[in-house]
From Swiss-Prot:
Record's protein name: Cytolethal distending toxin subunit A
Segments of this protein annotated with the region Disordered: 20-48
Lineage: Bacteria, Pseudomonadati, Pseudomonadota, Gammaproteobacteria, Pasteurellales
Lipid metabolism is among the record's keywords: no
Native organism: Haemophilus ducreyi (strain 35000HP / ATCC 700724)
Alphabetical list of SUPFAM superfamilies matching this protein: Ricin B-like lectins (SSF50370)
GO molecular function, one term: carbohydrate binding
One GO CC term, this protein: cell outer membrane
Keyword field: Cell outer membrane, Lectin, Lipoprotein, Membrane, Palmitate, Signal, Toxin, Virulence
Signal peptide: 1-15
Ricin B-type lectin domain segment(s): 123-212
Amino acid sequence: MKKFLPSLLLMGSVACSSNQRMNDYSQPESQSDLAPKSSTIQPQPQPLLSKTPSMSLNLLSSSGPNRQVLPSEPSNFMTLMGQNGALLTVWALAKRNWLWAYPNIYSQDFGNIRNWKMEPGKHREYFRFVNQSLGTCVEAYGNGLIHDICSLDKLAQEFELLPTDSGAVVIKSVSQGRCVTYNPVSTTFYSTVTLSVCDGATEPSRDQTWYLAPPVLEATAVN
């Protein structure tokens, strides 16, 4: 178990962009990935979208309760990376779809939907995460996370970052009082992201520690 530190002042990261389309990696099941109305249902996977049109990059939101997506410097962005190297990412592009964690090697064609901007929430001690490509925000929903239109009036989009003595953070939902959890040892190439009791767990079946890491980018070989 990780030991939480008493306070947190975390801001800033480096970033870049990539302009690729999502690839056709398949997942088990074929049911809808749209978040159900019931708050007790777990996220369910489906095959990845293919032939997705290219999206505008280097996006973030500006001021106001329903923030508009505006161009921004890529240095404003970061990734949220688990200890197994999996990155928190949008998977289905439509709003109110579940978020997942994918290793970089299996999500290279996802492009900038794996990058996030951390910015203050309505309550200054909390933060929210804005997707670089879509301008949507991470939102606590049921037993997992979805992405939806950003609104400062949505408490479900505010999160508290709890530092640990390992340099990682635990991400706590303000609205639910539960923490973002993933399965670090998985038989698939993705990890399910859920909300569970905050205990700083680091186990093969569940982990709550995340790193605020540099954004992913398309690398170019230098001859």
